[in-house]
Amino acid sequence: MSSRAVMTIEPTAATLAATRGWLAPVRSALGAEFLAAYLHGSVLTQGFDERRSRVNLLIVSRSLNLDILDAVRSVLPEDRKAPHISPLFLTQRQIEKSLDVFPIEWIDIKERHLLIEGQDVLGGYEVPRSNLRLQLEQELREKLITLRQAYLANARHPQVLEDVLKASASSFATLCRSLLRLRGESPPAQTAQVIERVAD
């Protein structure tokens, strides 16, 4: 049964089917430890291109000890055809302990996720916003420094610069959504509208 967040745009049936197909052996390996699997990130935005972008998949487990990790590793699909699944494995305790450390990421996931398997374990969490401004400023400064260094190193190589910008686009979109939240605004689901709102 699927659960949809307010900001979510439904992924294509093909993407959902491919993700569930990837997840099936992983869920089987986790057995009773498996709790939930969520799509999150750009796959739930308008204009997502599965040929180029990765499908972010959060998998929540009761435990992730070494035996469990070995069981999961042995069944991880090796098919490199699109869509490309990017899994993040966490326990409930790890989520609880990281909410205040990574407010940007968790607020974004809380507002833009789709439960595709298991029970909803994210619904009861509240993300503290006390560190949001600090993390946002730190990451924006880091991104700007990285882009400046890339420009200086590759000014004569426009294709390299284009690749750097493309690789940075998704993370900048996440930061822009966080900037809107810091201003007390609700970010739209469409990335283009997010950028327009930040530019106003």
Name these PLM-found stretches:
Residues V6-S28, T45-R52, L57-F102:
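Metal-dependent nucleotidyltransferase catalytic core
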Residues Q119-V127:
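Extended, charge-rich low-complexity interaction segments
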Residues S2-S3:
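Serine residues within intrinsically disordered or low-complexity segments
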Residues L114-I116:
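A charged, well-structured terminal subsegment
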Residues E126, N131-D200:
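Conserved nucleotidyltransferase catalytic core and NTase-mimicking acidic/glycine-rich helix/loop elements
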Residues L35-V43:
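Short gly/ser-rich loop at a beta-strand->alpha-helix junction or flexible surface loop bordering the NTP-binding
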